[in-house]
Each structure stands twice: as structure tokens, then as C-alpha cells.
Amino acid sequence: MYTIGQVSEMFDIPVSTLRYYDKEGLFPNLERAGNIRRFGENELELLRIIECLKKTGLEIKDIKRFVDMVQEGPSTYAERRQLFEARKERTEQEIARLQRALAMVKFKCWYYETAQKDGGEERLAKIIPDGL
């Protein structure tokens, strides 16, 4: 079992964020010893999933719905799969967008390195299509 401070350090997540998650019901089976939250392996695994879903842009209310589905059991497998399929598609689209941006950044690095070596952009203007 881990304290909220230990979990905060392990995941590099502020204690206030963990408290917020708890307040929002994202840790339905979180044990308490008095006023001290005790995180077990199940909560750590759930936190990994929560952070993953957050990184894909899912809102807390929708993450809460996922947590509720897990609590409901196997009857929600199809809905959970659908959630992750949608997250996968969104993440793949975001990766593609970032890859295009990275390609442009790499091109501009090359472009300005070449312009610097050449002492200007004249040669580049002749070999590169308009619009770049």
C-alpha cells in the first residue's frame, strides 16, 4: 500500500490532482486508514489508465464513466472496447498531425542550415517549389 505522497512521487502527479481524482470518484475502492488514503496495486493500475486516457484528450467525466463501467463488470466490455477504439483513432490522428509538423520543422532546420552555409537563400529559391 502507498500513501498519496508516494503515489504523487511515483507518477509525478501533484497530490492535489490525486485528491481531485478521488473526489470525482475515479478510485471507487480506495482504502482509507483514518484520513489517510491507501493506494493499492489496483489503484496504481487504474491511475496508469486514467493518465493514458487523459493524454488522449478524454475528459474527467468520461474517464469516470469508464471507471463506472469497470465496476459494472463484464457486461460493459463492448462499451469499454468502443471507448478505447475511439481513443486509438484520435491518438493516431494526432500522431499523424504531429508527424506532419515534425517534417516541416525538420525541413526548415535543413533550409536555414543550408541558407546559412550558402550565405543566402538564392540557391534554395531555385530548387524549392513555391509555398515552402
How would you name each of these model-derived features?
Residues 8, 26-27, 45, 72, ...:
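A generic structural signal for solvent-exposed, polar alpha-helical segments
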Residues 15-16, 34, 61, 72, ...:
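Alpha-helical structural elements
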Residues 55-87:
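Amphipathic alpha-helical dimerization/coiled-coil segments
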Residues 75-132:
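C-terminal regulatory/oligomerization modules of transcriptional regulators
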Residues 1-67:
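Basic helix-turn-helix/winged-helix DNA-binding cores
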